[in-house]
Amino acid sequence: MHTAAQFSISTLNNLYEISSVEVGQHFYWQIGSFEVHAQVLITSWIVIAILLSLAVLATRDLQTIPTSGQNFVEYVLEFIRDLTRTQIGEEEYRPWVPFIGTMFLFIFVSNWSGALLPWRVLELPHGELAAPTNDINTTVALALLTSVAYFYAGLHKRGLNYFGKYIQPTPVLLPINILEDFTKPLSLSFRLFGNILADELVVAVLISLVPLVVPIPMMFLGLFTSAIQALIFATLAAAYIGESMEGHH
């Protein structure tokens, strides 16, 4: 009976710890009458600083015969270029390589920062820090950038004829075609946000149950999932841009 009671108490304690795992507490700056979402700004600036630092280090001493570090950077650039060319097409892809590359690298580093950097160790007066993509504001902003990009691409390539796609194959589908242009990138943002948030919550729950062993495989799985989510977002963003210039679904 004593052992059973101890087991029950231990189980209740574990359940209490799990119930205390929160979706996230945000850190805000109060500037006048405006409440600024500081958590996203701080972590986004850190991610941008990491990317800029890596870019400076990678291009500081370029060699005709590339070193191992230069080889890696060239491989990443070639990967992004091939991804963009595959989705947009041989003739139109070059101007869009920087945009797709920026999207991919920002999301990739943001996702990995959530898995590798101990954001929550940094104590704040209130709230907590987390990966930028762990916040719906960031992923929706990326979705809106994608929307602006493919609207611009379609109008730049096809002019006012771009709007003709909304009444194809029949004008009856006009509302659905308009709605589709906004739901496609938003679905990307919700998928990215949901996957990153779920990964962090699963790791937090497992750490509360088995602090040492079990979370490690989940963290490696989280790194893999984070990379896949960055690839999916960049690939579909490029596909939407290519689709807008081609003028068909």
Curated annotation (Swiss-Prot):
The gene is atpI. Keywords: ATP synthesis, CF(0), Chloroplast, Hydrogen ion transport, Ion transport, Membrane, Plastid, Thylakoid, Transmembrane, Transmembrane helix, Transport. Its main location: plastid. F-type ATPases have 2 components, CF(1) - the catalytic core - and CF(0) - the membrane proton channel. CF(1) has five subunits: alpha(3), beta(3), gamma(1), delta(1), epsilon(1). CF(0) has four main subunits: a, b, b' and c. It is a multi-pass membrane protein. The keyword Cytoplasm does not apply. Key component of the proton channel; it plays a direct role in the translocation of protons across the membrane. One of its GO terms (molecular function) is proton-transporting ATP synthase activity, rotational mechanism. This is ATP synthase subunit a, chloroplastic. InterPro entries: ATP_syn_F0_a_bact/chloroplast, ATP_synth_F0_asu, ATP_synth_F0_asu_AS, F0_ATP_A_sf. It comes from Physcomitrium patens (Spreading-leaved earth moss). HAMAP family: ATP_synth_a_bact. Belongs to the ATPase A chain family. The chain crosses the membrane at residues 38-58, 97-117, 136-156, 201-221, 222-242. The lineage of its organism: Eukaryota, Viridiplantae, Streptophyta, Embryophyta, Bryophyta. It is found in: Plastid, Chloroplast thylakoid membrane. GO terms for cellular component: chloroplast thylakoid membrane; plasma membrane; proton-transporting ATP synthase complex. It holds the Pfam family ATP-synt_A.
